[in-house]
């Protein structure tokens, strides 16, 4: 084969030649080239051929490693080459004394071809492996023929150099060599050396971790641990699967089981067991080519099967589904594990959440049937307190302080009430850990050595983003003042507020059935009398979330699915239900279903189990707890009948006249589950002045940032009450009167008039009309005293 001619090609750019990096020969390759020339000189050959070069490459480490991986018998090849050089190349012997052997054209082409390939690959060093591959291009040479006789092809060499895939299965662990397309470190281990254990490379020994004290002790969870041990002792399908919400302690059960094993607190059948936690990241890292991942996983499975007391723990086990699969291929980690899991030779423990279990794990029926599902529910508050008391010494040692028993109790109770995006005990552990970490931020002189309830409350307030006073408020004090507080905020509905307060106190006193919500109330009465306002103020007073649903959005039959989620096969199945997700995130809340009579009757049927058993199952089969919910429904049924005047004689408005309308609208089983139907009375004229004052104070609160104060004269208050009073429409007409006669003129003054920099607005009456007297702000006094604060009369 002749070298290609460069005739007709454009000359290379001298600037490119200057910046191009010329590859150098590795020291071992230089020695091999000198050895090839020395072999020719020793035999007084006139030319150094490819056969001389190949014989020298047998002793070059990189080339020798490639040939070994490609099943080449180096001793046999060496003997064949030596015989060929001594017998068939005898014609090259020269009689000229002291002459040096000259490389043949093929010899030079091979070296040049290897250098060009290395340079085009962006590397800087030519190794013996590159030269060995280049020899195969000289197809008519005896050197290439001898390699092919050893059943070695160019593909075998390139496959091992680039991918680390050895043709000889007995050649240790597949590894890349110098000369691959990406720079690699030279492996020090040679073929035949003991391989590192796959378990030690890709798994973590939880028993060793427990002996070192890196695992927290397992407290409680006796039922779950007993069930897991029972499954592990089975003959077949001995694979427990821990399924639960994030933060309930699934991984802690597996680690705690290892801790119990080294403490000899397990049955004799598990006394010698070792739990290995699979490191999926280490298993996948570096597996760039097909076959690498499967080879690693099979090695792990084989070693586990050879270890009769081994238990494999896979955290987040849903990640094995699809791991290592090529595009469109079905061979992933889960399919590699199935045969071992079926026969009982491999004991595997997994953990996952309900969401991933439904979305990934449950869909693979062949895999899920090999596991025995164990539900890990959120522990109760007393159980969570026990868990934290057991973990307390570890956190005290880490943070170098102490927690009081009240602090632990407060952490669990407050985390259960206010931190709703995480579950116990994880949320409570986060609270005490962060409370301890907060002390590291203060100076030594101010650092506290004992943390109590106050520090825990401050941390919960930061995590839950609520005012600290709401956290530290005593429940007993709040309940005692509940009636008085609501009466100050909502006017004219004293009887309704008294009935509501009495029902809530009854539930908080523990005299209510434990599986029911705190209260189920139906507020009835005319529009605009404060039904929705009572629910808002109740949530604010108790310091809980208000979940408000306007039932006019749920008038169609299919709209019910928005509350609990769409069924499988329908759009929105993966989004969840607005009602179930909202209560799941805020278990302690006031649930307000506004204008319930406008909803489809199917909504009433959904609420039956909520009012009776405090549970509602969403579209995924998850039961949502409503036991800490105050359910309030408002309705205007009967308001139209109450607004009608009797023919002939007038009558006095009375509360409770809408009872017949309530009975017509709601079914007996729905009404029978209500704690109370609370009727709101129409607002009287004597109440309207208090409502006027409240609206004006709300307006002043909106203007406080603009430094604008409002002073309302008694005449103006009476005028607003007279114009805004409507016994049929409640307080809403009053809001429109205030907007028309006060807010609109104020907007002009705030934007373009005298109130751009603040000031005082006096609201009076002149010629039976509202008049605004605007005073610009006074200049600051020299004494630095502030002007007295003016409030509405």
From Swiss-Prot:
Which Pfam family is one of this chain's hits?
AAA_2
**Cellular component aspect of the GO annotation:** cytoplasm
Determine if Repeat is one of this entry's keywords: yes
InterPro entries per the UniProt record, alphabetical? AAA+_ATPase, ATPase_AAA_core, Clp_ATPase_C, Clp_N_dom_sf, Clp_R_dom, ClpA, ClpA/B, ClpA/B_CS1
Q: Where is this region: Disordered?
A: 1-24, 169-194
* Superkingdom to which the source organism belongs: Bacteria
Q: Name one GO biological process term.
A: cellular response to heat
Q: Where is this region: I?
A: 199-447
Q: List the disulfide bonds.
A: none
Keyword flag ATP-binding: yes
Keyword field = ATP-binding, Chaperone, Nucleotide-binding, Repeat
Q: Which SUPFAM superfamilies match?
A: Double Clp-N motif, P-loop containing nucleoside triphosphate hydrolases
Region annotation (II) maps to 451-639
Residues the record lists as binding ATP: 244-251, 525-532
Q: Which GO terms describe its molecular function?
A: ATP binding; ATP hydrolysis activity
Please list where the region (Repeat 1) is annotated: 25-88
- In this chain, the stretch annotated as Repeat 2 covers 103-168
Residue ranges of the Clp R domain? 22-168
Give the matching NCBIfam families. ClpA (TIGR02639)
Family, per entry: Belongs to the ClpA/ClpB family.
Q: Which protein are we looking at?
A: ClpA homolog protein
